[in-house]
Regions:
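Single conserved hydrophobic/aromatic residue that forms the stacking wall/gate
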Residues: 153-157, 161-165
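Cytoplasmic membrane-interface "Motif A"-like loop-to-helix N-cap segments
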Residues: 62-75
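Cytoplasmic helix-loop-helix junction between adjacent transmembrane helices
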Residues: 105-140
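Helix-to-loop junctions at the C-terminal end of transmembrane segments
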Residues: 51-65
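Hydrophobic core of transmembrane alpha-helices in multi-pass small-molecule transporters
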Residues: 12, 80, 94-115
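Helix-loop boundary and gating motifs at the non-cytosolic
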Residues: 1-49
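C-terminal ends and interior cores of transmembrane alpha-helices
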Residues: 75-93
Length: 165
């Protein structure tokens, strides 16, 4: 498989993950009675984005290759998001804000740095393949946006149908 195809798949999946929860989270929080905390959940993404990419960037530059750190970060974020999902499914409408917020915060603390790490991995791979990153990367990156949009449409479709009926 060519490097471009692999990077297209990586970007598609990178942003499909984000689209899967970003736009539907507010509706979920309203449904479980945590509507007054929606802003805190969304703000946490910005807060962790201020320092976690720098921290993991330093780790990637000094000790762990970016590809391995990207994998570790995605896996760890997925574990915490799965734990948050499992917690939400088992508690139903009796979700505790502190527990859900902690699991979500830990998930985004590991997910948000993957945005920069995936770009670093892509640029390094393109350089190693002898390709011009300025010309080659933008058409690859657009598949991240496509992944985000398709994911949010797929996830929000049942919600949209519930509102219509």
């Amino acid at each position: 498989m060519s490097i471009k195809i692999r990077l297209i798949i990586m970007n598609f999946l990178q942003f499909a993950v984000w689209g899967a929860y970003l736009t539907s989270m507010g509706s979920y929080l309203v449904n479980v009675g945590l509507h007054e905390h929606i802003g805190m959940f969304y703000a946490m993404q910005g807060i962790v984005s201020l320092f976690m990419p720098a921290v993991l960037g330093i780790i990637a530059d000094r000790w762990i290759p970016a590809q391995k750190l990207l994998s570790f970060s995605h896996f760890t974020a997925a574990l915490f998001m799965a734990a948050a999902g499992y917690y939400g499914m088992t508690k139903g409408a009796e979700v505790d804000f502190g527990t859900l917020f902690t699991l979500y915060s830990l998930s985004v603390a590991f997910y948000m740095p993957t945005l920069a790490l995936s770009n670093s991995v892509a640029y390094t791979a393109l350089d190693k393949a002898g390709l011009d990153t300025i010309r080659t990367f933008p058409p690859i990156r657009i598949f991240g946006t496509i992944g985000f949009i398709l994911s949010l449409i797929h996830i929000s479709e049942p919600t949209r149908l519930d509102v219509i009926s």
